[in-house]
Amino acid sequence: MNNTNTNTNNKNLASSSASVIFSKYINNNNNKLIPFKIKNSDLGRTRYFPPISKEWKNSIYVFNHNNLKNLPLFDININSLIKDYFNLQFKDKILFKKKRLSKVKVVSLNKIYASKAEIKHTNTKAILTVYTFNREKISLYKKIKKLKKSFYFVFDKIISFSERVILSGVPIRVDKDGKVLSNLYLPFRLRGVLPWITESHVNIWRKIIIASLYKELILLRKYKLRLDLNKYKFEEKLLYRLNNLIMKYYNKKVEFNIVNMRSFLLNSDILTKILALKLKNRNARVIKIMDVILNKANLPKINRVQEKASLIKSVDWNLLENKFKNLNLSFILNDASYAERNNLSELLNKLYYNVLLVSQKGVWALRSPKGEQPSFHSKSGGSPTKFIQKGAGAASLGGNAKAQPKVSSFAKAKKYAKIYQIIFNSINYKNMGGLRLEIKGRLTKRYRADRSLFKVKWKGGLKNLDSSYKGLSSVNMRGYAKPNVEYSIFTSKRRIGAFAVKGWVSGK
């Protein structure tokens, strides 16, 4: 009995001493007991991961590493093939009476510029993405417009001359070359001369028109031939030949994605090529050319103070992860209303693709809840239903806006608008943020290396707004390259020596 009492007393002393030590520890550390509560998640949006093609020009995975050794050489050969393909022209005998100098062909800026190919490999095919700027097409259309004005000018002269001849009553004599031998002049124009026109007059006028517009017609034929060749370069009629040549390198099928750009400023490869070609001219002024290119860059007009302001950290309740504690579908259905439970597609559509139709300054646009970017808009005004109905007609009837769309096509247009906007808003760095140009090398008329130039000019900025100002994390490519900046370098030479052009294009 004595032993059992002593054991119980020892246990009581140990427990009391432990409780005293625990209470002293709590009082000394000033810790408070926190009851168990369910804490809501405060996750932020996931970081934007740029496409892998912007990091590596070749995206490939192979089991045998020896297959990768030839890829750098293949890239050089394929890029030169693509460049030569887009520089294809007719023989000089077809378009010109005498042979053109090769220097004129190289220095000419009116051609199709192509960037370096971005190649994605699969087991069965290689997908080549090439960005192009079709300067030749723009210049040819401008020349045709000038010809159109000259046509009208010559026709006015012929009509006024024919009116004078008909009024005089003297027969018109035309030689073999179509030149009119009778030279009459009257100081006024006669209107309503159609009753006097005969078949002989029509034949004579045809000869006069052909003789007077001979040069213009020959030029028009040349421009038409060049336009047709320019068009066929982007079609399967000629692309299959380039396809067959590239297939010999990779021993698999080749697929092309050709992106025709509206401005050469949107791609750094094309930008540096054009700048280097302009600097090949000995009389070119370096600073002036750089200013001309930078002035063509249209940066969005945004309040710089608001754009660079740091974000206030707060919980984004629009995210699905923060709306629900559990992302299981059964848990979401229990919290939903009875009507939404029966229609699962409407519930998911409401949760993920909540697109609002907003009217802003007479322009109906489909926008996200934050109003980040419009998917498409109509400046003609009208109600939003008419706007979507027009899109439904275009989507269902191949762009025939006159046909009346059915109810199903109206619903398809709404879904199409949502999908379009979701994809469009998920892409970052769509707007141009800035440009930077560097030129270095022998760009003076002196045969001295110490007279080489180094010029730098920029417009806008190259910094990533998320990581530099807003305090958000961003993904770096290859450890040092910024995801919002595209960089390229192009080397060229003059009679005196070589020079290089560097270009940076940033997005935001």
Swiss-Prot record:
Domain of life: Eukaryota
Protein's cellular compartments: Mitochondrion
Assigned keywords, A-Z: Mitochondrion, Ribonucleoprotein, Ribosomal protein
Disulfide bonds: none
Segments traversing the membrane: none
Record carries keyword Protein biosynthesis: no
Keyword check for Disulfide bond: no
GO CC, any one term: ribosome
Similarity comment text for this entry: Belongs to the universal ribosomal protein uS3 family.
Biological role stated in the UniProt entry: Component of the mitochondrial ribosome (mitoribosome), a dedicated translation machinery responsible for the synthesis of mitochondrial genome-encoded proteins, including at least some of the essential transmembrane subunits of the mitochondrial respiratory chain. The mitoribosomes are attached to the mitochondrial inner membrane and translation products are cotranslationally integrated into the membrane. uS3m is essential for mitochondrial protein synthesis and required for the maturation of small ribosomal subunits.
Self-association and partners: Component of the mitochondrial small ribosomal subunit (mt-SSU). Mature N.crassa 74S mitochondrial ribosomes consist of a small (37S) and a large (54S) subunit. The 37S small subunit contains a 16S ribosomal RNA (16S mt-rRNA) and 32 different proteins. The 54S large subunit contains a 23S rRNA (23S mt-rRNA) and 42 different proteins. uS3m, uS4m and uS5m form the narrow entry site of the mRNA channel.
Protein known as: Small ribosomal subunit protein uS3m
Organism of derivation: Neurospora crassa (strain ATCC 24698 / 74-OR23-1A / CBS 708.71 / DSM 1257 / FGSC 987)
